[in-house]
Swiss-Prot record:
GO biological process, one term: biphenyl catabolic process
Protein name: 2-hydroxy-6-oxo-6-phenylhexa-2,4-dienoate hydrolase
Sample GO molecular function, one term: 2,6-dioxo-6-phenylhexa-3-enoate hydrolase activity
Keyword list, A-Z: Aromatic hydrocarbons catabolism, Hydrolase
Species of origin: Delftia acidovorans
Length: 286
């Protein structure tokens, strides 16, 4: 297998869905076999490649077609003000992308805010949903044990409102357990993504005013999700509370939970080898 990189796997598709008319979605596409769509979270500067470049190679080597999709209004995808719950819009964008690419069914890997999109996708399009892998997903309402919004979400909104290198470093400090991993390369790469399209920042805040995060709660519908699901969480997550993982496995008919120690909100990056082994085994045997 030749070495994968961002530029050689990069492409755009144009989708037409409700609220996303003639809308360009950016993705990185590599490999052949069953489709695995990986969807990043909602922090400023987030993108498919930056979130999952430590995972795409092992998944392709294992025989999967891997698609790293940029969410609407993030990274290289077109921008938009969302008038509905973000998870609904995210799910709709996945449906549109799958239609253009000719993919009938896909396994879905989603984290953080995009986790709400995975849950909505599985609810609305169960026949097109393979297995689900969720990492600290949003969209599950309040916590029994933790005041919300948590520290990481507060810093995320601060970075959207006041974009600066200092604010970015503050947010990254609560992304990772091992602070030595916050390198200049990581910071500058994320900062370049933030600066690529300032409209993304403005539109995120406008969208949040129209539909607050507190309105995202698919908990009552969790028992309807029949897909086999692996839920993963960082024990030290400072964005989404760990007890939400228990809520998922208590209410979804076929869900299991794995908690990574010494891990905050980026298991697929901070513990890439362990994450890849766990998730590939789940896809093959779960």
């Amino acid at each position: 297998m030749s070495e994968l990189n961002e530029s050689t796997t990069s492409k755009f598709v144009t989708i037409n869905e409700k609220g996303l008319s003639n809308f360009r979605i950016h993705l990185n596409d590599a490999g052949e076999g069953e489709a695995v769509i990986m969807l990043h979270g909602g922090g400023p500067g987030a993108g498919g490649w930056s979130n999952y470049y430590r995972n795409i190679g092992p998944f392709v080597k294992a025989g999967y077609r891997v698609i790293l999709k940029d969410a609407p209004a993030l990274n290289k995808s077109d921008t938009v003000v969302m008038h509905e719950q973000r998870g609904v819009v995210y799910a709709r964008s996945v449906k549109g992308m799958m239609h253009v690419l000719g993919i009938e069914e896909a396994h879905v890997v989603r984290k953080s805010m995009a986790g709400a999109g995975a849950l909505n996708f599985a609810l609305e399009l169960p026949e097109r949903t393979g297995k689900l892998i969720l990492m600290g997903p949003g969209g599950l309402g309040n916590s029994l044990f933790t005041a919300m919004p948590m520290e990481g979400i507060k810093l995320l909104f601060k970075l959207y409102a006041e974009p600066s290198l200092d604010t970015l470093k503050q947010m990254l400090n609560v992304f990772l357990f091992d602070q030595s991993l916050i390198t200049d390369e990581l910071v500058q790469g994320r900062w370049a993504n933030i600066q690529r399209n300032p409209e993304h920042l403005k539109n995120f805040l406008l969208s949040a005013q129209k539909v607050p995060l507190s309105a995202w709660d698919v908990s009552p519908r969790l028992p309807e999700i029949k897909a086999k699901t692996l839920v993963t969480w960082g024990r030290d997550d400072r964005f989404v509370p760990l007890d939400h993982g228990l809520k998922l496995v208590a209410n979804m008919p076929d869900a299991q939970l794995h908690v990574f120690p010494r891990c905050v909100h980026w298991a697929q990056w901070e513990h890439a080898d362990a994450f890849n082994r766990l998730t590939l085994d789940f896809l093959a045997n779960g």
